[in-house]
Each structure stands twice: as C-alpha cells, then as structure tokens.
C-alpha cells in the first residue's frame, strides 16, 4: 500500500469531456405596454406569440457564451397588450467533445439550462407590468435542434457550426 494519491484518475478527468456552468446572467431585458393604461379596462382575452433564438460565441480558451433570446408579444383582441424580451446568457466551460457533441451542447443543452431563468424573468416583468402571470410552457430544445439539423441537411447546408 502506498501513501501516494492516484494521479491517474485526475489525469483521466482532465483528458475526458468536461462541462461546467460558470455564470448565468441577463444580457438584455425590455418590457413595453404601449396601450396602457387603457388596456387594463378591457376584457382580457390574450393571444400569446413566442419567438426564440439562440446564439453562441467562443470566449477565451474553452469558454463559450450562449445567449437565449425570448420575445413574447401578447395581444388582447387586435391590440398589443405588451411586448417583453429577455436575452438570458450563460458562460460555459466545455472541452473534450467532438464536433457533433459540441454543436448539440451549445445548440440544445445550454439553452435548456438557460430557459427557466428567462421564463422567470419574463413572468416577473409581466406581473410588475400589472398583467396576469405568464408561465411559458417548457421548450424541447433537443427537438428544435434536431429539426434545424434536418432543415439544414435538406437545404444542402453544412451542419450547425460549433461557434459563431
């Protein structure tokens, strides 16, 4: 028996795939209620439109910034009740992945981590704007990623780059 630590296990961890969330933050946030206060006196029959987008960029070393943008427009009848947009971002340490795994991680896994924070920020803004709470349904980023890959293949485009 030896008093020496098993350095082989540490070396394997350093050489294998690594993923670590470093920071989550709001990059941009906006709320507009163009028809207030008149909109508050109308019967509330909302229709919700959600637009989402993700982008990623490399930082120094093996660090990446992923930004999830959610834009929500709620109409009450023919009028816009409110528009809210959040850019929820995260810094991730990612290394040791092949191109396909890196693309999936940046395009689906990281946005999945960011979504609950963006959803909460939107809900808080809506409530502070004196509107009923808006709880967005979960988003299947894996399915969206797969659809985008299929669309690109059918269009003859190269698969999603790992960085932009």
From Swiss-Prot:
Single GO MF annotation: unfolded protein binding
SUPFAM superfamilies, A to Z: SecB-like
Function field: One of the proteins required for the normal export of preproteins out of the cell cytoplasm. It is a molecular chaperone that binds to a subset of precursor proteins, maintaining them in a translocation-competent state. It also specifically binds to its receptor SecA.
PANTHER family per record: PROTEIN-EXPORT PROTEIN SECB, PTHR36918
Compartments (UniProt record): Cytoplasm
Summary of subunit composition and partner proteins: Homotetramer, a dimer of dimers. One homotetramer interacts with 1 SecA dimer.
Keyword Protein transport: yes
Cross-referenced HAMAP family: SecB
Keywords: Chaperone, Cytoplasm, Protein transport, Translocation, Transport
Annotated Pfam families: SecB
Domain of life: Bacteria
Protein name: Protein-export protein SecB
Family: Belongs to the SecB family.
Organism: Pseudomonas syringae pv. tomato (strain ATCC BAA-871 / DC3000)
GO cellular component: cytoplasm
Main location: cytoplasm
Biological process annotations from GO: protein folding; protein tetramerization; protein transport
């Amino acid at each position: 028996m030896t008093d020496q630590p098993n350095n082989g296990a540490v070396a394997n961890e350093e050489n294998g795939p690594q993923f670590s969330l470093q920071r989550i933050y709001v990059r941009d946030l906006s709320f507009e209620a163009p028809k207030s206060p008149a909109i508050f006196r109308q019967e509330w029959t909302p229709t919700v439109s959600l637009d989402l987008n993700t982008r990623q960029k490399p930082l120094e070393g093996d660090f990446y910034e992923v930004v999830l943008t959610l834009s929500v427009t709620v109409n009450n009848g023919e009028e816009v009740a409110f528009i809210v947009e959040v850019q929820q971002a995260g810094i991730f340490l990612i290394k040791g992945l092949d191109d396909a795994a890196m693309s999936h991680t940046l395009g689906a896994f990281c946005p999945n981590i960011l979504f609950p924070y963006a959803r909460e920020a939107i809900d808080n803004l809506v409530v502070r704007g004196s509107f009923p709470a808006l709880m967005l349904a979960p988003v299947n980023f894996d399915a969206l990623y797969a659809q985008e890959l299929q669309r690109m293949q059918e269009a003859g485009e190269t698969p999603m780059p790992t960085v932009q």
